Amino acid sequence: MAAKLKTAVLGATGYSGLELARLLGRHPRTGAPLLLRRTAETVTKTGDTDGHPAGLPHTSGNGNLPVQAPIQPFSWSALEQHGVGLLFLATPHSVSRELVTEAMTGGLMTRGLRIVDLSGAWRLKQEQHRAVYGFKDANAQTAADLTERAVYGLPELKPNADQIPSAALVANPGCYATSVILALAPLLAAGMVDLDRGIISDSKSGVSGAGKEPTARTHFVSVADNFSAYSVFGHR
């Protein structure tokens, strides 16, 4: 049996990080990941023990989730200490942009560390499209090189499926992009879409896609039995 790949999830306190930790914990090739949080994140431990934060059942095995590990502060040395070979970033766009650049300049990626980024930091290669994120890279050349090297992580399509296994940096697609691409790809391949008439995608998602930060807009009383449009002219 092949040795399990040691993984880590940075941003394990968020919805994406929680779900990712659950999937990794049940995967036969990975097992429970190292759970990490940024030092700027605060974790409430009231009502829990052994360093397992209350309200985060994936860190204590509650809720039938097979991950039992406290969330630790992130550091590059912690990754090396635990022998992590694959790091998942469930962090904001700007944070992912900064961290991957640090990993490259610090030599971790050249020493074998691979990164899968769940944000939009590395998805778009065309500069005019990346402009919507307003990135301000401290190391512009390294960031540009990483942008070119990043592989779009949609394995259902070629050549992505062939590139992902050996990629040092994988840019995980967003939810809307995934749903639209997977629906359109076979239709386009079969020549069933009239591109001259354009394509309109009417997409909707659950409110959890907005993240766990509480706002009046995402409060239960605002979203229950309701529907609203957001970022109509600036969605990324």
Task: Please tell me what each predicted stretch does.
Residues 2-232:
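N-terminal Rossmann-like NAD(P) cofactor-binding subdomain of oxidoreductases
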